[in-house]
Amino acid sequence: MPGAVTRDEELAAYLDPLVARYETEAFIASDPVSIPHGFDDPRDQEVIGFYAALLAWGRRDTLLAKLESLCSRMAFRPYQFVGSFDVDRDGGRLADFVHRTFQPSDAVWLTRLLSLALQKYGSLNAAFVAHLPAGSRDVGPGIDGFVRELLELDERTPERVRKHLARPSSGSACKRLAMYLRWMVRPGPVDLGIWTRVSPSQLVLPLDVHSRRMIDRCGLSGRRTNDWKAVEEVSERCREMCPHDPARYDFAFFGPGATGEDPGPPP
């Protein structure tokens, strides 16, 4: 029937008010995105933001305390600290930094690899864009290439470091890197929007337990696990609802589960 409301329009009408509810500055203080928000220089924001996203699991109060400790160890100059990092000179600052399964050796090696990337490209933005094909529909190829090169920058990189840096080609949902890219690319009250060479239309949804509950309620994925195929499926559905900014719906999916609120049944 002409003028009939489509399923995507129904879902957008349900989800858009949830985005408006949760995508506010009030969200920032208790979220790891608050850490890069604490810096003014975009170079500092992208560097410390990478650590904040990569370590984003477990209790939030514990995570934020650990990230504040990391900032202090870097003398609150993450770009300078990482860019000029020397293991013999600076490794001691990270010698006892632990967050859950992330050990001091992981911190040293990750910082070593990021330092090499900054020395080669000047910024993590440039390092990422170097691996994102022109016209790519989503950021998947960029994530894969960026992580692959990062791990290859030093042939001595321990195998255990790889488990902290997921790749789509391994089937992983790459939740933390998808979240990092949302922070870097999307402008808004919560996200930083400092990477202008990547379009918000290319972003994918970070999938986790909280967001998956809402995604399943809305019938947006037929897959039972949070893998890269599920990421592509959900992101494509969100792209159909909002072609220029699919990742905005992360707030609608994550917010209710994280706060324990019940938004009511979807249409």
Regions found by a protein language model. Give the residues of each.
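HhH-family (HhH-GPD) DNA N-glycosylase catalytic core used in base-excision repair
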Residues: M1-P267
